[in-house]
């Protein structure tokens, strides 16, 4: 373990002790300064981001990755607004969860407290730097950030802005730190830093999550892989379904809550798929279809090719869409269980009974009825900027907002009580 990373961990732990004692007013003041500095330093931030974009293009990175990497004035404004929204949220730290008084007279309360130090490993998403920093600060947690090399210029300027704001607010600079060295071995070292780090949150592709699961000695939040499905059932309103599917697939295809596989009930396939192909033609969606859907889509000259088995488990993060024909809801649910990632899956239907069946039997973090999967987001759910979307079941599930960055302690107060 390098001395540098050990020192970062030690500094983060010391900062976490300070943050845990702060009032909501003190934390909100620091967050307000961060939001102000994001706006004041926007030109510098965007200029540094363009360096990352230029390198990404030079290195031949995909359009999906470049879209994730890109900051625009609008996106930077959205990030600052997310910080303001976090300010407006109630501080969960110190909340009384439950409690009572024992026969012995001992008063017991379960109180919400910060986790301590969070380690976040992420790829080409500079917005994560501010999302994580603001949520951790609001909940009294310190954080060590390790962004991908693709975001080195963006992350450095963003962390500089945050640390400057912390100092202005009279808080420890080391509450928010970033590993700027692109050496991949430092990721492995961070995963072993259990003396100081209390939780690891990876945000990236399947390989990153698998790496963290296999090598971390620190609890890991698993999630973010979005092989999301929509099942359109024969009683659905087909005209209303078209713009919904367009939204789920094309609004921002590089996100983890984007639709990747459309399941179409056989009874409406011949009627619906030509309409879908026409509706999505302007968006240049490329279909990957099973034999039945392939024949229908080819008959209307859609951009389509046969779907390969491995593509049914693929997070496209692009304008590609799998189309699979199923006989009924049972086949749709079976397909989702086999190929889904337990992220976000939905049904389009006019049947309350089938909607209830789908909700009960699909085991995903977010299950939708007649709505786009694009809603799986901390801001959309009213949680503020999210730190991640968890697809596991322990500790947190779905978009992780403020409460997901806390744990609890038992506070026991007596009058010199002894156990009999």
Curated annotation (Swiss-Prot):
It is an enzyme of class 1 (oxidoreductase). One of its GO terms (cellular component) is cytoplasm. Gene3D superfamilies: Aldehyde Dehydrogenase, Chain A, domain 1, Aldehyde Dehydrogenase, Chain A, domain 2. Its EC number is 1.2.1.41. It catalyses: L-glutamate 5-semialdehyde + phosphate + NADP(+) = L-glutamyl 5-phosphate + NADPH + H(+). GO terms for biological process: L-proline biosynthetic process. PROSITE patterns: PROA (PS01223). GO terms for molecular function: glutamate-5-semialdehyde dehydrogenase activity; NADP binding. Pathway: Amino-acid biosynthesis; L-proline biosynthesis; L-glutamate 5-semialdehyde from L-glutamate: step 2/2. Keywords: Amino-acid biosynthesis, Cytoplasm, NADP, Oxidoreductase, Proline biosynthesis. Belongs to the gamma-glutamyl phosphate reductase family. Catalyzes the NADPH-dependent reduction of L-glutamate 5-phosphate into L-glutamate 5-semialdehyde and phosphate. The product spontaneously undergoes cyclization to form 1-pyrroline-5-carboxylate. This is Gamma-glutamyl phosphate reductase.
């Amino acid at each position: 373990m390098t001395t540098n990373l050990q020192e970062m961990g030690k500094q983060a732990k010391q900062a976490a002790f300070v943050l845990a004692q702060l009032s909501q007013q003190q934390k909100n003041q620091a967050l307000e300064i961060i939001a102000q500095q994001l706006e004041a330093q926007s030109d510098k931030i965007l200029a540094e981001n363009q360096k990352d974009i230029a390198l990404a293009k030079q290195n031949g990175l995909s359009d999906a990755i470049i879209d994730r990497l890109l900051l625009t004035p609008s996106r930077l404004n959205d990030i600052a607004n997310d910080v303001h929204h976090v300010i407006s949220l109630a501080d969960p730290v110190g909340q009384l969860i439950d409690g009572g008084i024992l026969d012995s007279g001992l008063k017991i309360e379960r109180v919400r407290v910060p986790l301590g130090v969070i380690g976040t490993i992420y790829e080409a998403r500079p917005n994560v730097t501010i999302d994580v920093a603001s949520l951790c600060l609001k909940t009294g947690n310190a954080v060590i950030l390790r962004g991908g090399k693709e975001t080195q210029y963006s992350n450095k300027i963003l962390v500089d802005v945050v640390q400057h704001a912390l100092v202005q607010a009279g808080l420890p600079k080391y509450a928010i730190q970033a590993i700027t060295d692109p050496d991949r071995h430092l990721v492995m070292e961070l995963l072993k830093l259990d003396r100081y780090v209390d939780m690891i949150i990876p945000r990236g592709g399947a390989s990153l999550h698998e790496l963290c699961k296999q090598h971390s000695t620190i609890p890991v939040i698993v999630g973010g892989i979005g092989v999301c499905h929509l099942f359109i059932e024969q009683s659905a309103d087909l005209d209303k379904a078209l713009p919904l599917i367009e939204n789920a697939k094309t609004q921002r295809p590089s996100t983890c809550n984007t639709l990747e596989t459309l399941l179409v009930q056989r009874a409406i396939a011949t009627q619906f798929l030509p309409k879908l192909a026409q509706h999505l033609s302007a968006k240049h969606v490329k279909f990957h279809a099973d034999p039945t859907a392939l024949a229908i889509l080819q008959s209307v000259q859609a951009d389509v090719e046969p779907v390969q088995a491995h593509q049914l488990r693929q997070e496209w993060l692009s304008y590609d869409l799998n189309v699979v024909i199923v006989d009924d809801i049972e086949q749709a649910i079976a397909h989702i269980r086999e190929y889904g990632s337990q992220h976000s899956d939905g049904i389009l239907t006019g049947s309350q009974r089938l909607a209830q069946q789908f909700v009960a039997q699909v085991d995903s973090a977010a299950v939708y009825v007649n709505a786009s999967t694009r809603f799986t987001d901390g801001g959309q759910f009213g949680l503020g900027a999210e730190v991640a979307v968890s697809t596991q079941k322990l500790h947190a599930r779905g978009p992780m907002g403020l409460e997901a960055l806390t744990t609890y302690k038992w506070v026991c107060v007596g009058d010199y009580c002894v156990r009999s």
